[in-house]
Curated annotation (Swiss-Prot):
This is Probable xyloglucan galactosyltransferase GT14. The lineage of its organism: Eukaryota, Viridiplantae, Streptophyta, Embryophyta, Tracheophyta. Functions in xyloglucan synthesis by adding side chains to the xylosylated glucan backbone. Involved in the galactosylation of hemicellulose xyloglucan. Belongs to the glycosyltransferase 47 family. It is a single-pass type II membrane protein. One of its GO terms (cellular component) is plant-type cell wall. Residues 1-30 are cytoplasmic. GO terms for biological process: protein glycosylation. Keywords: Glycoprotein, Glycosyltransferase, Golgi apparatus, Membrane, Signal-anchor, Transferase, Transmembrane, Transmembrane helix. It is found in: Golgi apparatus membrane. The chain crosses the membrane at residues 31-51.
């Protein structure tokens, strides 16, 4: 936090005046002409000297052009009464071990991206700017068609996760402006939005430029030296693989942010983790951002009371370009099952699957929601299905089980059905038959567990959470703090904090850890 910028009249400069005496009456007028002039000169000199103590020299801000020093706080919160850094509580308060320090990055790394949102594209949409409003939640949904609650539903873009998380962090109750108290350091770089500007038609030098500039800035900050960056973390609304380009071939996808030597010391939270141990998955943002516990409870009760018309549902489009995709088989079986399966066709030109009214209308009427991998392992749809109380059915462990360890139960059979498909050529699953086999008692238990998970996978209003409730943000912060503490404990014991920190673990995406057959009873 920058020191207060005092005006000349506000600066706490104290001048003590004395009484001058003279025995020369003839010089009296001259003396009293000189004395005021002397004091005026002293005052001016003191002002210039003292003002140096109050120059805008934020210890977290490296010497950079003035344009990058623009304060970002007002860009991320609409609450004029909010104090970015509350008074640090006493060391024995509930914030002990939970303090987080937020770097005030140069403006080009976050706020400037929002100011120039028209330069960012989703690939399927020309204008991402409307999604920035309302803390990054996007426009309020007004035509809820008696499907959604009358409030707290928004048209949310998954790429806005970094903006949503930043707004939530600004309102985190255990912020500190004293980095020596902090257990973790948050780096509010909008990595996904930055890279989205350069994914198509730009060379790797341009794609990697912001990553290099960020790391150059971070490593000279005093906070970096404490743990060589291993207590630092950032968040992205893109999958972690987008930041792990493994070659310098111009045709390769993404940036090399996570392969830069300094960046390997940091952790990244994103909608999908990679094979590296310092990448962690947190939920995709859904379109429900409740303002209170009462709203969550109301929604949960609505989902419990639903009479579900369809046995299973699939919302998506075929992926014929991916030879290993199971989607074609799933769509075929859904069409064969007629009234027992509902197909929400999300192919271009069909139903708008970004509209939560369309998605929730189907999911809330289905017992099971099929969740095959999409363009990558994970799908936002799985969190929409949880939100609707629809039991997710997974075909690959990388879609959920290897991902959201802080948010979903370790016992994956308690909330989902697993039908592993290692090779689509060997597809021998009859989805309808497998789902019908599950006893009604177990279906009820599964649905109840899914509904119980709803508070853990939503990003609530930034003011929400002060009552001790844990939403997706709170659980992500808790998980990150625990991981950093593990590294810190290693260092206390004289061990190398880098040992295993950024190792690669491809095993977690294989079927082997999850090969035990599920008990359907």
């Amino acid at each position: 936090m920058r020191p207060k910028n005092y005006s000349q009249m506000e600066k706490p400069i104290s001048i003590t005046t004395g009484k001058f005496r003279t025995n020369n009456n003839n010089n009296h007028n001259n003396v009293w002409f000189v004395v005021p002039l002397f004091f005026i000169l002293c005052f001016v000199l003191l002002c210039f000297d003292y003002s140096a103590l109050f120059t805008d020299t934020d210890e977290t801000a490296f010497s950079i052009p003035d344009v990058t020093q623009k304060s970002t706080s007002s860009e991320f919160t609409k609450d004029d009464n909010f104090s970015r850094f509350p008074d640090d509580p006493s060391p024995d308060s509930s914030c002990s071990g939970r303090y987080i320090y937020v770097h005030e990055l140069p403006y080009r790394f976050n706020g400037d991206l929002l100011d120039n949102c028209f330069k960012i594209t989703r690939g399927t949409e020309k204008d991402i700017c409307p999604y920035i409003e309302n803390y990054g939640f996007g426009p309020v949904i007004k035509n809820y068609e008696n499907v959604l609650l009358k409030q707290s539903w928004f048209t949310t873009n998954q790429f806005m996760l970094e903006v949503i998380f930043h707004n939530k962090m600004i309102n985190y109750r255990c912020l500190t402006n004293d980095s020596s108290l902090a257990s973790a350091v948050f780096v509010p770089f909008y990595a996904g939005l930055d890279m989205s500007r350069y994914l198509w038609g730009f060379n790797i030098t341009v794609r990697d430029s912001s990553s290099h500039e960020l790391m150059d800035w971070l490593v000279v900050q005093k906070e970096w030296g404490r743990m060589s960056g291993r207590d630092h973390f950032l968040v992205s609304g893109r999958i972690a693989w987008d930041f792990r380009r493994q070659t310098d071939n111009e045709s390769d996808w993404g940036s090399k942010l996570r392969f830069l030597p300094e960046s390997r010391n940091m952790s990244m939270l994103s909608i999908e983790s990679s094979s590296w141990k310092n990448d962690y998955a947190i939920p995709y943002p859904t379109c429900f951002h409740p303002r209170s516990v009462d709203e969550i409870v109301e929604w949960q009760e609505l989902m419990r009371s639903r009479k579900r018309e369809y046995l299973f549902t699939f919302a998506g489009a075929p992926r014929p370009e991916y030879k290993d995709s199971v989607r074609g088989k799933i769509i075929d079986e859904c069409l064969e099952s007629k009234k027992q399966c509902y197909l929400l066709d999300c192919n271009y030109g069909n139903v708008n699957c970004d509209n939560p009214v369309n998605v929730m209308k189907v999911f809330r009427n289905s017992v099971f929601c099929l969740q095959p991998p999409g363009d990558s392992y994970t799908r936002r749809s799985m969190f929409d299905s949880i939100l609707a109380g629809c039991i997710p059915v997974f075909f690959h462990p990388g879609t959920a089980y290897a991902q959201y360890k802080w948010h979903l139960p370790k016992n994956h059979s308690s909330y989902s059905v697993y039908l592993p498909v290692k090779d689509v050529k060997e597809w021998n699953i009859k989805i309808k038959e497998r789902l019908i086999e599950i006893p009604e008692e177990r279906v009820v238990r599964l649905r109840e567990e899914v509904i119980r998970l709803i508070p853990k996978v939503v990003y609530a209003d930034p003011k929400y959470g002060s009552d001790g409730s844990e939403d997706a943000f709170e659980l992500a912060v808790k998980g990150m703090l625990e991981r950093i503490e593990e590294v810190r404990e290693m260092m206390r014991q004289g061990k190398d904090g880098s040992d295993g920190f950024d190792d690669r673990d491809d095993y977690k995406y294989t079927f082997s850890p999850y090969e035990e057959p599920q008990v359907l009873a």
